[in-house]
Amino acid sequence: SAQDVMRIKYEETFFMNPGPDMPPQMAAQMPKSRKNRKILLATEENSYYFVNKEDPDPEEEHGGNQGRWAMRRQGVDPKVYSDYANEQKLTFTDLFGKEFLIEEGLQPAKWKLHSGEQRDILGYTCIKATQQKDSTTITAWFTPKIAMSIGPDGYYGLPGAILAVSEGESRVYLATLVEQKYTGDAKIEKPTKGTKTTREEFEKIRKEKIEEVRQMNGGQGQRMFIRG
């Protein structure tokens, strides 16, 4: 039925880029990537993407002795709510201790299908699709076997569930578990907390805050990884 809830677990890998202004010895110590685990709960109408607290944190699991690079996320865990029927996306996140609710439209991107290219993920045959986002190529792998137009982190708009996404060289999402009929306690929640803002406004505030911190550090260009 339309109200069946599907649950997909994803692992996100974020590749770290030291940037030109980081001292070489610091860049050498910096880990190449870090991982997060997330859960997507979805129906035909909406979805909720949030931090997976059930499974061990992958950073701690792998020894996690990266000192200050372990990058334990301070503040709140980001949550993304997608309302497919009304094409609305809400992202709850924080920036230097202040909570925000980012409201934006949810337009399915103009995906280009590459039906000749396929790969297997968790036993599901997936088809490749791509889109351009500014200068970045986004590659998604979706399976028509799960006939729901859903995906991680607000990605959707393909004729099937998206089980993997790569954002250029910077981030990869990969499904690690698919439950077609989820019967657990977690619920799809529409976030309401936080100062309401647009994506454009949030990015502007973020840039200003990062510049402030840079100035406080004497202009030392420590690259900061903050993502709403």
Describe these PLM feature segments:
Residues 3-228:
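Extended soluble regions of mature proteins
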